[in-house]
């Protein structure tokens, strides 16, 4: 049963480390389970750290400490071309690095720096500070700087009161939002109930208010249709009046021509011939 738990712990620590540090398949090298079972003071994994990248070191250390119920240690080492980090479940076999952990630590070639959770807590400006991050920077020549960045308040009581104020403000805003959502849902339910039963009065006014947004577009479309039909009727009436006038004038002209033709036909024409 203990071996099964160790295997689960092994897989959990490896997956959590890759997830938290966002490691690729070529960024780390893990130690086999059989070798760890024979000598548990070997590192579980060795990681090649990138430059100018913020690693969430305190979060990973806290997770390892919670899973293993022990005091894990991360050892930083300058290999000459990069900085590696070896993750140990226990203290390493040989003491590597006796330097005190500070915010900025200079590592020369083959020098090591061992970091524990107590070292991180000692660097934090306050108990309620955010998780400390680790950044590797190139210094000069073949030296590197291991920098630990921690943010936190200098006054704990002021920080706690500020957190309470922010939390209460968010809670009040959340309650107002929840109440407004409940009111809108109740209004929709009442309006749908009124529309189904066809009731009028005060409940009908609520239904009209609730459905005003839905029917506004329909009313606008109906208004435009009425306006269009009215304008087309006015245009048609104007055209019909113009056509009537033209027809009357043409009829009068034809009647005048016909009257002239009749008069000319009834008038006798003088006889033509030689005068005696």
Curated annotation (Swiss-Prot):
PTM summary: Phosphorylated.
Highest rank taxon of the organism: Viruses
Segments traversing the membrane: 246-264
Perinuclear space side: 1-245
Keyword Transmembrane helix appears in the UniProt entry: yes
Record's keyword terms, sorted: Host membrane, Host nucleus, Late protein, Membrane, Phosphoprotein, Transmembrane, Transmembrane helix
Membrane topology value: Single-pass membrane protein
Location of this chain's protein in the cell: Host nucleus inner membrane
Pfam families registered for this protein in UniProt: Herpes_U34
Gene Ontology CC: host cell nuclear inner membrane; membrane
Residues in the Nuclear compartment per record: 265-276
Functional description taken from the UniProt entry: Plays an essential role in virion nuclear egress, the first step of virion release from infected cell. Within the host nucleus, NEC1 interacts with the newly formed capsid through the vertexes and directs it to the inner nuclear membrane by associating with NEC2. Induces the budding of the capsid at the inner nuclear membrane as well as its envelopment into the perinuclear space.
Subunit-structure text: Forms a heterohexameric complex with NEC1.
Family: Belongs to the herpesviridae NEC2 protein family.
HAMAP family: HSV_NEC2 (MF_04024)
Protein name according to UniProt: Nuclear egress protein 2
Gene name for this UniProt entry: NEC2
